[in-house]
Each structure stands twice: as structure tokens, then as C-alpha cells.
Amino acid sequence: MCFFENNQAAYFAKWLYFDSCDVEVVADTTFSAARKYLRNGNEQKRVAVLNFANPHYAGGGVEHGAMAQEECLCRSSNLYPCLFAPCAQAEYYQFHRNRVDHLFTDRVVYTPDVVVFKDDQPVPQLLPREQWFRVDVITCAAPYLGEPVHISPSDLKALFKSRIREICRVAMEHQVTTVVLGAFGCGAFRNPPELVARAFREVLQEELYRHSFSKVVFAIKSNGRPDDNYNVFSKVLGQELG
């Protein structure tokens, strides 16, 4: 299911309202964080995770052994074939291949009920059948700063906030109660983690979005360095949003 930049007026037909939103930063992987939440008495809750997409090719470099977040999601679930749906191929991947800039767009592919059937070790192992679980996946691309891009920090932050709002709106439209996010675009796409973390914080402080989810989890693997993405996001998002 594809969501375009210009169809936001159709949203909010059935969105939920929560008195407060619990925001947590955890040193974990995306699917592992979702699995732990679902196993903690929340099996009936609707959980969505953010897939940090390659906007040109479904699954990025999964067939070539790449180990970024999207590839790990594809190796552990049936997400990869789902991204070859005609709508996703035409309106997301081909659409972005036809563009010449590296900032990409706010377009989103929403895939409900993805089945996770492997763990997310470097070489994923099949889980026992009773440990399989389902999550919704929100596929969206961050701007890519690995190529020369002429954009000011303030404009980049505004772009991220627009994209984050779109991710939230799509999740809200599907009555997601818990969303698992992360250091969106702060790895191979080379976006500055503090700027991205502050963009997330400011959106989640807005009146609409602060009541949209019961829980928001930022799952970010830590490499132990004081300046790694996990620690930067923990510093920015680990305090009350107010």
C-alpha cells in the first residue's frame, strides 16, 4: 500500500488518542525490540516498525549480503517479496529511480502483517514456530548525504520533520499503538544523528503526535562509543518530551 505526499487530507479516518506517549531508546535491533514488546503481554497490540529504505531497489543490497537495517529486516521476515508488489514497484521504487536528487520524498510503503520467522543475528536462524510474530512495516527513505547535497542544516531538519510526520500519519491511519523507530538515515546515508534525533523529538512534542501512540521505541544498536547513534539519541530523547 503506497502513500503519496499529496493525499494527507484523506488521513485520520480512525486514528486513536492516548493521554500520554512513552518514548524509550533501547540498545537493540528493530525486530528484537518489537518481539520483546509483543511478548510482554501485548500480543493484541498493533505494532509497526520503520524500514530505513533504499528508495531505488527493494531490499537494498540484501541479495549481495549487505548488513544494513533494511537488509536485516528482509533476511528475517517475508518483507522482501512484499516490496515487489506492483504498487510499490511503480509508485515508490521506479518513481525514485526517475528522480535525480538524493533527498528523495515523503512517500511511504505500508506493509501490514509481515511475518518474522528468523532471529536477526548476522546469519539468521529459523525461530521455533511458536515464536514467529507479525508486525506492520513502514518503508521510507531518509535523505542520502553520501553524495554532494546543497541543503542547510535548518532545511535538512525541516525535511526530516516533514518525513517523520508522514511516517506517523500512516501509522496512525492503521491504528498502530506502538511504533519502533531508530537512527533513521544515520548510518550509510550519513545524516547527522543529533539533528535527526531533535527532528524526531520536536515532531513527537507536537500536539497531534504526542497523543498518537501509547509507546514509541527507538531501537539502535550500540557500538560502545560515547558518540555513537545510541548515545546521541538517548541524550536527546531520553528526557521527558514535555
Language model features with spans:
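Macrodomain-like recognition of ADP-ribose-binding/processing modules
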Residues: 1-179, 183-242
